[in-house]
Amino acid sequence: MKLHLMEHRKAGGWAVFGGYWPEGKVRENAFALLDGQGREIPLQSEITARWADGSVQWSRHTASAERLGPGGELMPRASGETERAQLQVTEERDGWTVTAGDFRIRVPRKGEDLLSACERDGKEMIRSVRPVLRLAHASETEETENGRKICVTRTETAELPGVIRSRMLETAGPLEAVFRFDGVHLEEGAEKMPFRIRAMIRADGEIQLDDTFFFLGDPESDRLAGWGLRFGTVLSGRPYQRHLRYLTDGAVYHDHPTQLFYWRKHLDPGLLAAQQRGETVPAAEELDEIAEDLPRWDRFCLTQDSAWHYSIRKKAWDRGCWLTGAEGKRAPGGMAVSDPERTVSFQVRDFWEKHPGALETENLSGEQPACTVWFYEPSAEPFDFRHYDRRTYPMGNYEGFDYMRPDPNGIAVTCRAAVYPSAGYTADEQLRAQNERIRNPAVYLADPEYYHAHRAFGYWSLPRKDTEVRAWTEKQLEAACDFYGEEVERRSWYGLFNYGDFMHTYEASRHQWRWDVGGYAWDNTELTPTYWLWLQFLRTGSERVFRLAEALSRHTSDVDMYHFGEMKGLGSRHNVRHWGCPCKEPRVSMAGHHRPLYYLTGDRRIGDCMEDSLQAAESLRAMPWFRREDGSLRVRSGPDWSALVSNWMTAYERTLDPRWRKMIEQGIEDLRKTPLGLSSGPQFGFSPEDGHLTYEGEMSGVSMHLQACMGGTEIWLETAERLGSRELADMVARNGRFFFLNAEERKRESEGLLEGREFGSPIYSAEMQAWAARETGDAGMAAEIWRRLLGLLYAEDRPEGFLGREEYARRPDGTPLTDIPWISTNFTAQWCLKAIVAAELIPEEMPGSFAELAAALREKPLPWKLYGA
């Protein structure tokens, strides 16, 4: 498998990447990695998925990006050969010791510390690493004073101790050891706000920490007032020999506990200049005396309070004021503390994107300074998890039901930090390089042609521009991604619990997305923008698309689904708050949304989330819509059963546990026995124990569109191929034909069973229809599918599609403000996904020229309008 470094990324630090293997080619976890000159590079490998025959489908690999450079080749090797270990883990009664060259760190088995006793070159660097959480309790009361009503808001904030309930060594290899810590925070004996922290310790001494916060508490009173990791560091030397640095969007900020300014006695100005350069000022009795008469700045904090502002502050006394010395727009999230012997640096991923965050150091002149990486910084307004109103609005504002369930209990968010303990002084350029490795890590991939040839993630097309219409379609696919990338910045879709998600529907009259309107605000995977972006990335290898897709998957896998409790594995439908809608469904949280990120990058947190989604089938019992009065369950063949199939198929390929395959095959067999297969129902009785679907007859007055537009076609076709199920593939084709036919034709071909059933616009089902046309060899049907799909975006008088903009105002400086007034994420995601898949299934029937397409549309105008127009 040939690998290349993704565009716009640098070959620095460690790379974790996925290998994809054709069925039957690789059996063992034994691989070799060669650089571009054919030299073998140290490699650590794991199997992440297998084919049904037991051969390797996906593998996870860790290697030095610096050594691999722009690319190389990954290949199977003889199973007897092993890598020479650069890192060793020794298990002892009271914990583990990890060593790599001159680096050493302890992982204690008991106590409050995650990590301890970190040394480099024989020098102690970090004494402790602990989770830190601050919880605020807010209450509002009305009081009467002198005849006046006064609203009194009281907020009490406490720092809660973290209790580690379990510690485990997940993996230990020649280059990396991964430890997992699960715990809770205690408030007066009550368990609050669980955490899961992974420490990935690399062979060069890099320590990467993925910290997941879970909400467990009372959303009416519990506010998040601070969350992060605190490092007990070790510094030596005089205060004027110590050094603090922050990375900013300008020059690196340098400071010291004691600055060598002194007005009563002339000091060599070169001393201050040397301090600023990070050079060690030699200790001297005279300087010690002078330092006693200078302020001692012991506390520093860089705070990113929004996506548009940061400040650097410091204070000399606990009860003294903060002084603000520098401000800017976007800090990249880097801090370092140094003395004459050592540097400990901290780098944070998505620092300003996931604001409010901070990097703080306390007691900088003391023996044990504390450095805290705040993922939610304490000076920000405590985060409020309450809903926006006391009722729901299912009729007026597109919210799901008339009952409330805006519950954040069980949702999560994950942040990443890296720590670099180094002997001596780490130069500014090295700090920036460290930050780049964390913010924009090296990603290694195969070419799109390789994934396409071996059908990774199902059916999708490679870009083609050999005809007028194909070239136009590719421009539209590019423009759609560009537009959403621009909207993230333009609309400031940033913040700890928001970053990565898109809004659902645009309101042209306000020139805003419907951020405050019920089910029209945050999208929460509605109509699978995840599938659109990941398939667009696979076919292009575009870094800008990868950035959108990765952020979307990281957000939706954590914030938009439940990770414990009675709704575990379910996700919340689109709403103004990510957890606000009463609809909790498996379609929002299914594993298929995130499989590409997991397999391409080996991200373990995404693996956790996909495992959590397995609980969705059982959790349906907690939801009134799925649970009937007698306690039995009902599901629709799509998007409910299709989402469960996504979860089960992912679990099966990761574990080869036959239970999950049997669940899928049971449902396929049950559907096969119905009069119309996937078109029957669409509601069935459901048994979460064995996956059994009970046919309960045909329904009228319902719509089938949700069966098709939530990834159903992609899930079923990939599952059919993985399991070799011709029955499922045929049912998809038959269903696609019913979606293609008009009402009278459907009634006739179904012998009246589908009378009164709505199937919706082709925007929902074009790829399923394309599968039907391909399987039946019906070229006329294929041409008509293209006419309908392309005609939803193209017209002779408006061929610009996603490239079009309308000016609605101007800034004071005359800069035009523009938008796409008809845009919606539903339409964008669906049109792009359908075009990508249909171009693979029925490529030859796509019209070649605009003249041909326009003539077809004039001859037979579409009955559907542009979605959202």
Q: How should these model regions be labeled?
A:
Residues 1-4, 452, 481-518, 559-580, ...:
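Glycine- and aromatic-rich loop/turn segments at beta-sheet edges
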Residues 5-29, 220-234:
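Surface-exposed beta-strand/loop patches in extracellular or lumenal glycoproteins
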Residues 34-58, 385-396:
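Solvent-exposed beta-strand/loop surfaces of large extracellular or lumenal domains
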Residues 58-79, 401:
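Intrinsically disordered, low-complexity Pro/Gly/Ser/Thr-rich segments with frequent PxxP/GP/PP motifs
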Residues 96-425, 430-446, 499-505, 521-524, ...:
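Beta-strand/loop-rich accessory regions of lumenal/periplasmic or secreted enzymes
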Residues 209-210, 407-419, 523-549, 587-607, ...:
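Conserved beta-strand->loop/alpha-helix structural units within folded catalytic cores of enzymes
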Residues 333-335, 377-380, 386, 390-396, ...:
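Substrate-binding groove/exosite segments of carbohydrate-active enzymes
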Residues 427-449, 650, 654-662, 666-670, ...:
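Terminal, non-catalytic domain-edge segments
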